[in-house]
């Protein structure tokens, strides 16, 4: 795979698209959600199928091998409150059980399976003849269906029994009451995709119905009602009669779905409509207005045919649909006028103003009386500007966000947002089974069409970049983000949530955690766009630009004392082949972006202008050019007053021959001394010279407990970052003991004091000595004479010295990582290897020169 292909693959695998967030969308639009209780059909589908008073056989809680009869007292979704028979009205022994886990069986199961049926110990002596007692108790009792209990034992809800491939009966709701078999293609939360039996999927006769729809029934319903099973007229010509009968015979041999699944369906009452009665109606196939309509046919006392009036010649197709007495969308004449609504005159109507009195006289018809129509739902909780999820009437496979634009009686006017094609405002009943509460699609795994502006709000690109691919990948991911934010298909986000461009000012001081070289390779800016989206990308790039990404992720981790009140976003980091995750708080509004960036910079101990909405061209307002890796806290301080330890034997880089290397490294206890106040005349006690760490890296020792809050990826070994970072800190901090000549060299007062403190508060150097591949000896015959105090060397002075040695190729690293004299004096072999990515040979060679500087410092300037 070439570089470009690898890059494309990395980009493709590193991008995640998150789902639409209702919470963010409601905040942006200032809307409210329709109450969950308003969607009765959704609430019904969550019911378990159990009802108070049902009896069943249940295992005793103290003896699972023994069973007794219990009565359902209360059913609450998956929980049942049960009472054993014999306790009467005594509630003390009532108990709750999970219907999926408890052993629940129908009455008679114990006898069939030769199980012990015995009363609980608490009431065992209460009745002398339990057999007679049960016979009296169970006479006329009802229990849950056997299929329901079997399904629950297999981990299936009642609704799950309507699985793909199941057969049902469906009435033809266009022109007659003929009923035919349909096959369930999909079941999404009770919303069924159906196909007429005998047809192929590509025939175009698939349709969607909710499982409680009045026109959908269990197998056998037509025979019970006296209706004939025959295919609808629209498909009848596709096969001959013999083929249809063969299909019917095959279906009848199959075991049907249990009828109790449909027990909550609406009961159809008898109607009082007559042929030629006039009314107002909403065409269910085009529910965008109210039109005059006529009762064209009465099939029986339950069903009739409504036809939308059309005064044009007969060769035009008539729009008709089957109704029953409770059908929504039919109104008495003048209903529109009384509710201040417009009624669409029938096509071919010549007058501009439609008047019912004139129209009835013209047609010679009578209006259907008020008593024929269903009772209006007087109490519901829908209000204008509420949001919900609704089926697209033109494309029933699509569910979109909808806004209630008007409420009239028990009817809603909805406007879809985010549908694939524009759809006019349409009318639904408050009891429609094509509307759903907030989050229904997400809960049931149904795709939700969302507005483009909202979709842009939550689209996120997450770059989890390998360290060695950081430079190239970060640029590529940024280009993808830029293209997304500037896409012509995205609509401008609400200004309150629109983040300005965030610039990376790589000339500013990068601090102890961030690699200045990697910062310089980041894109110039990210954004503009949604605040959460842009800031998430910025923080991801910064984490990947760190010496130790997991350390920066821990610094950024959500603090319980946070004052931002933003949103928590899960960010990722990779370090040494392990993946880490942590929740980081990000502000959501544009007015807080500047301060958020500044405080994040301070938290990372870098220049407050390193990244933010302001581009630094030449001179930083913070004058951060005077800062080095060792001088940050003198100017900005630390957010937390952490205890920082000094590495034992900090004056020497290499192990000496005076002590043997310990065979096995022991875990060093984290005992620390307080940080001394910085003085320009003394060597800083904190290991800030480490390019990776400054004070922060040895804070790993003090903060190891914090790493438990980082979630390690599944690919890592079975140990947390606490152990990993302890080892790293140990390796860096446990420098070998000083040489004999060092020990005889007088030290500055502060240094001597600190050395005594470190020696009394830490374990012996013999225990802390890191393992080395072989004993390393350093001869210090080559005396070095220094013209200036290395403690006061600038970065340029350090680079100049390195270039004068045989380690000149490494000078660039010292320049990039801004290592000044103080930092140079604190470098150790483990630190050099880890932070400069040097192999052992070059690292030893470099440390040899650093050792010479240290000896010269002690001899010339220590006093």
From Swiss-Prot:
GO aspect biological process, one term: negative regulation of DNA-templated transcription
MBT repeat coordinates: 20-120, 128-232, 242-346, 354-451
Gene3D superfamilies: 2.30.30.140, SLED domain, Transcription Factor, Ets-1
GO molecular function: chromatin binding; histone binding; transcription corepressor activity
Gene Ontology cellular-component terms listed: nucleoplasm; nucleus
Residues found modified as Phosphoserine: 764, 772
Location(s) in or outside the cell: Nucleus
Compositional bias of kind Acidic residues: 696-710
Known tissue expression: Highly expressed in the testis, low expression was detected in brain, kidney, heart and lung.
Superkingdom of source: Eukaryota
Region (Disordered): 638-773
InterPro entries (alphabetical): Mbt (IPR004092), MBT_SFMBT1_rpt2 (IPR047352), MBT_SFMBT1_rpt3 (IPR047351), PcG_chromatin_remod_factors (IPR050548), SAM (IPR001660), SAM/pointed_sf (IPR013761), Scm-like-4MBT1/2_SAM (IPR037604), SLED (IPR021987)
Domain SAM: 793-861
Biased composition (Basic residues): 660-679
Key words of the record: Chromatin regulator, Differentiation, Nucleus, Phosphoprotein, Repeat, Repressor, Spermatogenesis, Transcription, Transcription regulation
Main location: nucleus
Pfam (any one): SAM_1
PANTHER family, per the entry: POLYCOMB GROUP PROTEIN, SCM-LIKE WITH FOUR MBT DOMAINS PROTEIN 1
Subunit field text: Interacts with MYOD1. Component of the SLC (SFMBT1-LSD1-CoREST) corepressor complex, which also contains KDM1A/LSD1 and RCOR1/CoREST. Interacts with KDM1A/LSD1 and RCOR1/CoREST. Interacts with MYOD1. Interacts with L3MBTL3.
Entry text on domains: The MBT repeats mediate binding to histones tails; however, in contrast to other MBT repeats, does not bind specific histone lysine modifications. The MBT repeats lack the conserved Asp and aromatic cage at conserved positions.
Protein name: Scm-like with four MBT domains protein 1
Source species: Rattus norvegicus
Organism lineage string: Eukaryota, Metazoa, Chordata, Craniata, Vertebrata
